[in-house]
């Protein structure tokens, strides 16, 4: 599809974020399995639920524009997921607390991709005829910000302190 209109860019970016969220969902499930801190495990479980809600929302929006949700593959998130594997899942840690600190780091990197994506999509949708899309996407953006803030709270609370002990 030629990206010659804002609508075409909007659909392209919806599909890109749909792909990104699907990839980050699988990575977040694996991070949850690797985590040891109970607050972190809870936050990652909540993250899985939130990402799934985002995927569901994106799918509905994309289909409402007569487009295929799987129309794009997000190479940016593919790279971030590779980083999750390299720095957490396939890495050797002598300390669970240090692993938990790295889990937060990698999760927040994926989350920040989502923040950028949802933020752009909200801006694209704030035009005539897309108010419903904008509201749904704003909810996803707000939820993503909430998850990011929770990870920062956990990191600056017990996890980073335990990792430095």
Feature locations, PLM:
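Amphipathic alpha-helical hairpins
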Residues: 1-165
């Amino acid at each position: 599809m030629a990206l010659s209109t804002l609508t075409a860019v909007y659909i392209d970016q919806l599909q890109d974020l749909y792909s990104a969220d699907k990839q980050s969902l699988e990575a977040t499930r694996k991070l949850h399995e690797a985590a040891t801190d109970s607050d972190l495990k809870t936050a990652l479980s909540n993250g899985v639920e939130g990402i799934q809600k985002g995927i569901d929302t994106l799918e509905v929006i994309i289909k409402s524009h007569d487009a295929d949700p799987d129309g794009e593959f997000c190479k940016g998130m593919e790279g971030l997921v590779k980083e999750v594997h390299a720095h957490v899942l396939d890495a050797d840690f002598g300390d669970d607390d240090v692993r938990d600190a790295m889990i937060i780091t990698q999760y927040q990197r994926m989350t920040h991709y989502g923040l950028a994506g949802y933020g752009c999509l909200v801006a694209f949708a704030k035009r005539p005829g897309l108010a419903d899309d904008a509201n749904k996407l704003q909810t996803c953006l707000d939820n993503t910000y909430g998850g990011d803030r929770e990870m920062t709270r956990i990191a600056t609370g017990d996890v980073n302190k335990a990792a430095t002990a």
